[in-house]
Each structure stands twice: as structure tokens, then as C-alpha cells.
Amino acid sequence: MGPFSSASDRNSAAATAAPATATATPSPLSKTPSAATSDDSSTSKKFLKRLNILPLRSRTRNIADFHIRPDDPHRKYSAGDHVQGAVVLTVVKPVRITHLTVLLHGYVRVYKGPGAQNNEPVRSPAEIKNISSRGERKKYYNGYASLFQDEQVLSSDGRLEPGRYEFNFDLLFPEKGLPSSIDFERGTISYMITATLTRPTSVAPTTSCERKIYLMEQLDVGPLAPPKAQTVDLRPISKRAKKKRPAGGDRRSVISSERLSADVPAESLSDGDSARINDTSTEGSLSIVGDDVGQEGFSQAPRSVSHSEVRSLSGDSAASLSTHPSRAYSETNQLAIVGSAMTGKRISFADERTIKLRVEVLKGGCLPGDVIPVKVSVNHIKMIKSMHGVIVTLFRQGRIDSSPLQLSKEDWKKSESDDYYYPKSRTGLSGLSLSSAGSCSMFRKDLSQAFAPLITDPVNFSATLTTSVRVPEDSFPTIKGVPGEMISFRYFVEVIVDLGGKLANHLQGGASSGSRVGATGVVGTPFENVGTLPSWGATGSTSILDTDRLKRIQGVIPGYYEVIVGTTDSNRSRGKGPQRPSLTHTPSVTGGSNYVENEYNEKGGWPNSMHDDDGYGPESANPHDDYASYPPQTTYPHGYVQQPPYWNYVPDSSQHEQAIPAPHYIPPPDLPDENSLTEKERIRRAEQRLLPSQPPIAAASSSSFSAAVPSPSASSHVPDSSLLLNGDNIYDAEDDVPTPAATPATASPFDHALAPVYTPTPAEDLPSAPTLEELDRPPPISRGPSHHPPSTTEDKQELERRRLLAEASAPPEFPEDYIPDEGGGPVTPAGPSGSRAGPSAPPPAPPVAFEPSAPVLFENDEDYHGGGYTAGGPSFPSAASGNGGHEEETVPEYTYNNHRPGSVGAVTVVGNPSSPVLAPASAFFPASGSGNVHDSPREQGQQARSDSSSPPPIEYLPRYER
């Protein structure tokens, strides 16, 4: 007897104590009072009570609640797991019990029809017969079979007082041999927890309750090898030899000498017609003929172990009749091509005119959502082009058998030779049997489908392509191993190859209509190094082409390969297998290369087992087939298993070091403690963190756009001309050119753009080489007094921005209000602040003794030239002629205009490209001055005071006459 407990003390009660003595608190449920019988009750009531005609009257119940409560009700168990929980029992009146048991059991049930589960009675676990011993001939009990039972006794004989009881249990699943739970319209595989309460009464002595739990069989698809490849050889039959058919004598076989076996769904072997492949060429026709060749071109499983002769056609040369033994399997059907070897004079002709087809499924197991790649290799005798040349369909085959036989291996062999399993006809209706041999039913469900074009090389008539089909996400694992194969669900890949090139005429557009793009593959031919033609298809949610009628078309070869849909992949968990690909792309490699590590041996080539007994050697003999050049999957590190290896190529160590720099250690930022900061400071720092960040290079280039703020104290700074003469500052020479110091009263609106403080950048962040335009630029010159320190920036974009700003702010060449000076005399130059020259003008500096190729003008150049000179004015000697000894050249001529609205004055400069840089006025005029001055010094001072808040200073615009 198992332990039981009450609500007050769950584990304190002894296992051997009677339930009546347990410390159970009575439930506060009210008891129904028994009806008192009166002496004057009528005889009619006693009669009705005796006949029990009042079934609707409420009866007193001793047990109010009886149910099972698992500890983890939503868990999916596996083989070997423990199932823990409690049986809850609520008693309202004292009740005497014999015992209380709990049972964990699994069973298989097959219904007779789609709706029979509602009509058939519910079977008790005790009524379901257990599996019979090996060798015993016994049918399963009317579509029922028990998988296992694990029983535990919770309470023995005793009395239960009113109260609420909980009996804990711990049950165990077997270690192996349990299929996954499934419920469908024709059967079920279920696992139940059943609690049974037995009372010492003759009427309804047992009361039961049950709880359903779910089990998932753990299938590891990692160690599974791919299915064995199938090779089909088609050899021609001469038309002349076909007409000559002697009655006896020598015979010649025309079928391939290869025989391959594989599992095939039985529903595909219902028709016994032979598959024929015809070619309309003048040489003859291609055909596959055989006694055991079924509808799809594959042989059915023979019922006895005997030799099956191959149907052959006669020929001109002598040949021998060849037979091949059939291989019998106890629980599977066979998929074989039976043939005999070609002998005689026609061997060379047959080898040259043989069509070879090889189909390989590159994965033997997969998980839901995975992609199954399929490789097809064709060596044809002519050029074919079929846009639906390869059709790959993934389907699930369900098989149920309501009355299987439990036979041993010896009995199974015996049943193949006698009429035990397939009895003779008892009705005389040509094989019609009314026995239970027809209790098996099979169903097919197409899950997904993919199409791929088959285009052979016009040179060697060969093609190799790789396509794929996707397993739906909602697919459940393969179910096998049920006793007697009462219920089984298996997955197959059907590959249909159109060797005649006429399949498109039979599709009539039905292949692509209503279907969406499904699994994508890469398809190509051996003469194409890169596959460019994607495959298309459909899934279970869209229309899928019915391939049953296509398999009867001449020139169509089908094949079937079983794949296992599992729950785990040990290779993938270790990082050695391919990860599950995406829905929009299928890993596929042209030329037949794949990423399955089981297909690649340690020597860098494909295993010889694929080509055993085919007589043609490895397909790598084709010069266009280079699939063996790909490295195996196991050469890739763990980080590169997320995608197929052909696009995750890892370079060698030398290339890796050159391509990827060494990582730099970046220490974590030193964040101050904000607890000591004020709220205002924390808000300000939070706002700064929200500002967009800048990368180091971008920050260096953008910071170089700023210019230093000129200070009045630096107005007398003169750059060192020796640096310019040596050519050490050829990239930022324009920054050393002086500009007028802007006062707050006369500041230009563009000075604010140059106002931000400039932060020097490291030398490695600056431009490393000049442009061609800068190399063609002549060396700069230092002239006149400098009014601001030279800029430290060397950014070319900043120099270009300054030049554009200067051009935008310059006045037009000839303003609209231009009036030539009637006096023709020179004009007194203005001061650096934009007013006319006064006594406080700075003294001029001596010119530099070399000349540029073009004049460079700035705002303070008015200090060095006199006004009033028109375009027809006199020319002056060059400043370089007196110092450097150069020849005299004409100096640019200027016209001063003080009538431009909004400015103090403007000067238009007219010059030629060969003019030297303007020198101060002291270089051209004597100290006394010889020009005409329009304003006196007093008027100039008044004008300067009145224009203290004037807009920009005087500006100059060079004009070159060529």
C-alpha cells in the first residue's frame, strides 16, 4: 500500500494505517439526510420504489471528488522519465475500500472507420491484452494493443472517514521502444494515468478516473547516413533487332546489370505495368523491361526467396540469359532495377548510347523546418531542355493495420510460402478474399514540392544540378516501431526526372499555378561554374502537383528515398553539422557539391560506397564536374556553421592577419558618481548623452572645418617667410594670408561661421596627400602686415569653404551705381576698419622679393593703394622690380566707388594674370603724395566715427584680362 495523506498533514499518516484512522479533517460539506419512512406511506410509493422507476431522484454520494493531478501537466515526457503527481479523493460519508491503485500505461488503438471512435466502446486497460510472447501466433485484440504498464498501489483495505485525501505517486516510463503520442481520425497512440478505487460491493465495485499525458520519442538524426544513391542505366534497343525475334536459341538482355534496393511506399507499387523510356531517334528506342518492374520502374518485393528471371529480347549476336536473386525483407518493400549484362558485338555501341541517371539525397535525417538537398546527375545521348525536368516532392505516408499478426522471423518466412497471410480465394472470384488480409490501409499526404529545370550541356550532353525541398515547421517526428506495425508514419522524398524532355506538355501550366515560391535551390549544368536558375515549388498550404499521372509518361523516371524526421541533431549541437537554413534561401552548390559531412571522407573525396557495383566509377571523371574540390564540412570552425560553407570561406592565417586588424582594447568609460551632482547638472549631462555621437575620423575632419578666432592682439603678427621660401607649408599657405581684424562694430556676418574654437587633430587623422589642384598651385607669398595668427588647420575642405565665402561676399565687378571718378586723381586708401585712412593707420611693411602668378586680394589691401585710378590710369612698377631685380610689369588698376548702398566703399580691381601681388602705397608714391585726395584728414576722421557701425568693410574683386 502506498502512502497517503490528508489536507492537514499530508505525509504524517502511516502507510499501513487504515484510511479511517488518518488525520483527515472532515470536509465542511453538508450531508444529505436520509428520507424518513412514515407508517402511513402509501402502497403505491413503495411499489414504485421497489420497481426503481424514479431514476431522476438525487442519490446520496459517498465520494464527491476523485481526480488525478500531475505535478507538470503540460510537459512532454520522454522514455525513461518519471511521472509524479497525486490522486485527489474527497469523501463526504465514511466509505470502505478494498484498495486504491494508479496505473501508467500506453496503448495503440485503430478505428474501423473515420468516425468509429465515437461509436466504439471505451476499453479498460485491464481488458486490453498485452503483447504476446515471441513466436506465438495470436492476433491483436480487435485493433487494440498495449505498449506497457506500470502500476502502483496507493492504499489497501480500510475505511475512509469524511475528508480530503491526496495520494502521491511516482511512475516510470520504460527506457526505450515507445512511439510518440498521436491522435488522428483512424487511430491513436496514447499514454494515460488511470486511478482505480475498488470497494467491497457487488454493484459497480470499481470507480476510475484517468488523465492523459504526452510522450515524444527522442530521435537523433545526427548519426544517420544519407540514403544510398540510385543509379539507372538505360541502353538502346535496335529496331532491326527488335523485329527479329527467333522462337528459341540465344537471347540478349537489354537492361542494366545493376540492381539497387531501397524502401518504397507500398501505395506506389499497386500497378504492375512496366516503365518504358522511348527515344524517337533513328537508332532505336530505350526501354526498361522486367518481370518485377513496377509502375514506377522499380521492382516489387517478391513473396518468396527465389530467382526471378529477366525478360529479354533476342538479338543478332549470341548472348546468355542472366538472372539475379531477389532480396526479401520482412517488413519493407523493395525498390530495385533488375537487369542483365550486355554481351556480344554490341557492347561498345551500348556503352556509347547509354543514358545514365544518378539521384542522391544528401541528408538521411532532418528536423522540422530543415531543407533536404537532392543532387541529380544525368549523362544523356542528346540535348534536352525541360523547365520541369526535376520534380521533388516530400510526402508523409501513414499506414494502419487493425488486425496484424504477431509473428516471429521463422513464422514470417513460413507465411511467405504458404497461404497463412495471403490466403487463397474462398469465394472463387479470382483472388477476392474476405479474410482479414485487407485490414491494412495506407494514406499519403504531400507536404512540400520543388521544381528544377533540367538542361544538358550541348557538348557532352550531361547535367548536374542540386535542388532542395523543405520540411514544414509543423511536421511531427517519424513514428515507427509500433507492435505489429499497427500505426506508422514515415517520410519519403520522391524525385521524378524527365529524361524525355516532354514533361512540360503534360503539365499544362498546372505546376506553377496557384503555388507560391517554396524551397529555393541553385541549379546549374556542368559547363556552368555558377548556378543561376532557382527552383520553385509549393508547400502544404498551397496547391501541390499530383505526380501520380506523371509517373506513367514515357521518359519519366521516379525514385523514392526515406528520410527520418527527428527531434534532435547531435552533430548540430556540437557545431559540426549545418544549421537550419532560412525560409528564403536553400543551401545548394552547383556541380553537385554539398555540405553534408557524412558524404565527404578524410582524403578529400567522396566515398567509394556510392559507386559500388555500378560499373561506371566515380562521376568526378567528368572534366566539367568539380564537386570534389570543395573542402569537407568538418574543416570549418565553430563560428561558421550558421550557413552553408561555400559562402563562409575562411582565408588562411596570412590573409586573415592582413584583412582583419588586431583588436584594440577600449577601457570602459569612467563615469562620475551622479549622486553627488545636482539635479540641474544631471539633466544637462543627460542631454549631452542624447546628442549624436561622432566617429573619430569624422570628428577630426569636421573639427578641421572650424577656424581660430582672430584676436586684436595678433594684428601685427607677420608669418615667417623663410618657411614659405623653403616650401614647408605648401598645403595651408592660404591660411597664412592676412585678413583684417574684425572688431565688434565692423564684424562681417561670415565671421560668426569662423568663430568656433578650433581643436587641433592628430597628424594621422589629417589628409595625407595633396590633390592635383594643390600641386599645380604656385608657391604662396607672405605680403603685408598680418592681422591674425596663421591657421593651424590643413584641411582642404576648409580652404575651399573659405574661398567660396570670399567669392560670395565680394561685390560685382561693376556695381550698378558705379560712377567713374571725374578728378582722376588718386584716392586715399581706407583704414583697416573700413573707414578712410587716418593718422592711426599702421605703417606699411616692405614688400617681399618674389612674385606670384596671380594677384591675391584681401580686405585691407586698400591701405596699400591709392584710390581714384580708373582702367585707363597709369601703370606702376612692380614691387619686385625694385627689390628682386625682376622686369617691370603693369600693376592692376583700381577704381574706388563710395556710392554703393550699405557699405563704406568699394574698389573694382582690373589687372592681368601676370601682375604681381599688390604692395603698399609707400612702394609707389612719395611721402608727400602726388595724387588727388577727395577728403581731408578731418573729414576722414568724421567719416570713420559716423561709420563705426557700418556693415562689412571694403571688399575687392580681382578681374583678369587675358
Swiss-Prot record:
What the protein does comes down to: Required for the proteolytic cleavage of the transcription factor pacc-1 in response to alkaline ambient pH.
Q: Name one GO molecular function term.
A: protein-macromolecule adaptor activity
PANTHER family xref list: ARRESTIN DOMAIN CONTAINING PROTEIN, PH-RESPONSE REGULATOR PROTEIN PALF_RIM8
Q: What is this protein called?
A: pH-response regulator protein palF/prr-3
Q: Where is the composition biased (Low complexity)?
A: 696-722, 738-747, 830-839, 913-928
GO CC annotation? cytoplasm; cytosol; plasma membrane
Pfam families in the cross-refs: Arrestin_C, Arrestin_N
UniProt lists compositionally biased (Basic and acidic residues) regions at 793-805
Gene3D superfamilies per the UniProt record, alphabetical: 2.60.40.640
Residue ranges annotated as compositionally biased, kind Basic residues, are 237-246
What protein family is recorded? Answer: Belongs to the arrestin family. PalF/RIM8 subfamily.
List, as start-end ranges, the regions of compositional bias called Pro residues.
Answer: 840-849
Query: For bias kind Polar residues, which ranges apply?
Result: 297-307, 314-326, 581-596, 929-949
The organism's place on the tree of life at top rank: Eukaryota
- Extract one GO BP annotation from the record: ubiquitin-dependent endocytosis
Disordered: annotated segments = 1-43, 225-326, 568-675, 689-962
- Write down the species: Neurospora crassa (strain ATCC 24698 / 74-OR23-1A / CBS 708.71 / DSM 1257 / FGSC 987)
